[in-house]
């Protein structure tokens, strides 16, 4: 055993943690850029734009988690002296979309799948 065995082992573990953090940061940046580039007919009301998204990826599975907290929206419009009040209540939703592939390029497909959900509106 070499004299700096413990030091070398600690350095190896720190390098592994650093590499994992770098990969996670890269995935977050890729997700953020794909969300910004996403364009569909729903515009700003698309689940891709309105939900909080996070990505978990391993070598054999990718998982896109989405979450939206409950919210209330009230709009008052006055037309010809009469006011119309619209109150919308969203109960919130959360879930995940999983892909069991080994390709790193499936994130756009996961986002398109989330966009296609009609029950999330």
Curated annotation (Swiss-Prot):
Record key words, sorted: Early protein, Host-virus interaction, Inhibition of host caspases by virus, Modulation of host cell apoptosis by virus
Pfam families: Adeno_E3_15_3 (PF03307)
Gene Ontology biological process terms from the UniProt entry: symbiont-mediated perturbation of host defense response; symbiont-mediated suppression of host apoptosis
Highest taxon of source: Viruses
Key word Cytoplasm present: no
The keyword ATP-binding appears for this protein: no
Family of this protein: Belongs to the adenoviridae E3_15 family.
Stated role: Protects virus-infected cells from TNF-induced cytolysis.
Protein name: Early E3 14.5 kDa protein
UniProt source species: Bovine adenovirus B serotype 3 (BAdV-3)
Classification of source organism: Viruses, Varidnaviria, Bamfordvirae, Preplasmiviricota, Tectiliviricetes
């Amino acid at each position: 055993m070499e004299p700096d065995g413990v030091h070398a082992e600690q350095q190896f573990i720190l390098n592994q943690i650093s590499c994992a953090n770098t990969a996670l940061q890269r995935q977050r940046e890729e997700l953020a850029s794909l969300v910004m580039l996403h364009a569909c007919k729903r515009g700003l009301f698309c689940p891709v734009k309105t939900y909080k998204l996070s990505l978990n990826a391993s070598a054999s599975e990718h998982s896109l988690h989405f979450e939206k907290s409950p919210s209330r929206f009230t709009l008052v419009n006055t037309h010809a002296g009469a006011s119309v009040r619209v109150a919308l209540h969203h109960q919130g939703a959360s879930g995940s979309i999983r892909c069991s592939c080994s390709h790193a390029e499936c994130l756009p497909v996961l986002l398109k799948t989330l966009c296609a959900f009609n029950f999330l509106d």
